[in-house]
């Protein structure tokens, strides 16, 4: 099978989308399938682009001076389509176009699939309504959301208009972003989501195409070898790890506020970058928190850090649809801490601590309870270890292949 991935969130980035694409590419290639990846990226030398092409990874035309935060931005979809048609005419003979975002590169992939009559599978990874709300300053959110919505509608039809409501689209900016997400999904032949709760939200707002749940998996070649149950001795330091974006939507600042109220010893290690990185580091230093910010590092280093931790944290609320952080913790047998009840779907029962709400005071109470009952670390760790093989990508990739085969036969 020949499969072409298209994503605006792959090159030059870290996070769940990147991890899932890498894991799936490797697993598919190990089974003999041919996989291309097309992605937006920062400027590169021709020599670097040539080296990437050896692994069938290609950078599409991208803006040289215009970036969205720390994220590269593609050029207009029609420019990318022309580039793809000229430089990769072999795409006409591919079996599936597999789309992993809603930006310019992803739009181009959907449009080309439609032009070439190739089945398209769109993965809806995340809540763009919440991402836009957290990233864009107050006062500009509606303007930016309207502009993105308008730009998107130039290339893909917007047959569904999501109105404001009392559920998830409680302001005009969010309604605009839901309009974008729903119409993007409806242009594909099939939609995948990493979780059932996100599937239900997409259906609620008007996605009419078939939606299947396909959770992300952990790469087999990087799977931790023989981890043992974690233990926290009474009075000893609780080692907490964060390995996701340091950004407003991930709620780093509220978690630092919670740590200020923790009674007991802890060490907080942060791996990853983002819009709140420098602010968080300054705050932790000013408040004399035992927090260490390591920035973006290789996944090998993150794995080693996870292995020496007691507790993994993901404290976003009403934002994450899956949380690759949780899967990476499960593979290593590390208990997890979160605030969003939707995340209970992702990890096994008995392996996590969930805060009663997203408030820093409540989060601190949960952490203080854990420090007062350190024996719970081992109990949760043992649950994680008993389920960890379930998250291997090799256990899940056959499901994806069946999804592809079914859509090809239609």
Residue ranges and their predicted role:
Residues 192, 231-260, 269:
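Conserved donor-binding/catalytic core segment of Leloir-type glycosyltransferases
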Residues 95, 189, 307-321:
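Acidic donor-binding loop of glycosyltransferase active sites
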Residues 326, 331, 335-338:
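Short hydrophobic beta-strand element within catalytic cores of glycosyltransferases
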Residues 374-408:
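A charged, aromatic-enriched C-terminal amphipathic alpha-helix characteristic of glycosyltransferases
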Residues 149-226, 235:
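Donor nucleotide-sugar binding/catalytic pocket of nucleotide-sugar-dependent glycosyltransferases
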Residues 279-300:
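Nucleotide-activated donor-binding/catalytic signature segment of Leloir-type glycosyltransferases, i.e.
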Residues 351-361, 369-374:
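Conserved acidic donor-binding segment of nucleotide-sugar-dependent glycosyltransferases
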Residues 1-53, 58-59, 260, 398-401:
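N-terminal subdomain of nucleotide-sugar transferases
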């Amino acid at each position: 099978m020949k499969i072409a991935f298209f994503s605006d969130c792959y090159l030059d980035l870290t996070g769940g989308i990147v991890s899932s694409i890498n894991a799936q590419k490797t697993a598919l290639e190990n089974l003999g399938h041919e996989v291309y990846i097309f992605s937006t990226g920062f400027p590169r030398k021709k020599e670097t682009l040539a080296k990437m092409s050896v692994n069938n990874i290609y950078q599409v035309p991208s803006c040289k001076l215009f970036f969205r935060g720390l994220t590269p931005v593609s050029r207009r979809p029609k420019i990318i389509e022309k580039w793809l048609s000229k430089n990769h005419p072999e795409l006409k003979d591919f079996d599936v176009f597999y789309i992993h975002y809603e930006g310019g590169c992803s739009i181009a992939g959907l449009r080309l699939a439609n032009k070439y009559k190739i089945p398209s599978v769109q993965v809806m990874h995340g809540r763009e309504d919440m991402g836009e709300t957290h990233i864009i300053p107050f006062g500009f959110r509606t303007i930016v959301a309207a502009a993105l919505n308008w730009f998107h509608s130039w290339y893909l039809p917007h047959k569904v208009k999501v109105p404001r409501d009392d559920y998830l689209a409680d302001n005009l900016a969010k309604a605009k972003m839901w309009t974008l997400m729903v119409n993007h999904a409806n242009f594909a032949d099939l939609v995948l989501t990493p979780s059932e709760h996100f599937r239900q939200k997409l259906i609620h707002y008007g996605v009419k195409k078939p939606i299947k749940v396909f959770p992300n998996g952990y790469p087999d070649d990087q799977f931790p070898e023989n981890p043992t149950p974690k233990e926290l001795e009474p009075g000893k330091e609780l080692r907490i790890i964060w390995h996701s974006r340091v950004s407003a939507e991930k709620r780093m600042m509220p978690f630092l506020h919670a740590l200020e109220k923790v009674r007991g010893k802890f060490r907080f290690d942060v791996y990853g970058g983002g819009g709140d990185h420098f602010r968080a580091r300054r705050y932790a230093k000013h408040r004399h928190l035992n927090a260490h910010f390591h920035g973006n590092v290789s996944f090998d280093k993150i794995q080693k850090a996870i292995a020496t931790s007691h507790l993994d944290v993901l404290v976003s609320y009403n934002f994450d649809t899956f949380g690759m952080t949780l899967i990476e913790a499960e593979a290593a047998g590390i208990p997890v801490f979160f605030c969003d009840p939707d995340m209970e779907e992702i990890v096994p029962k008995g392996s996590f601590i969930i805060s009663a709400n997203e408030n820093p005071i409540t989060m601190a109470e949960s952490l203080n309870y854990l420090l007062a009952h350190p024996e719970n670390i081992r109990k949760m760790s043992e649950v994680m270890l008993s389920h960890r093989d379930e998250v291997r990508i090799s256990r899940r990739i056959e499901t994806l292949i069946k999804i592809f085969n079914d859509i090809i036969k239609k």
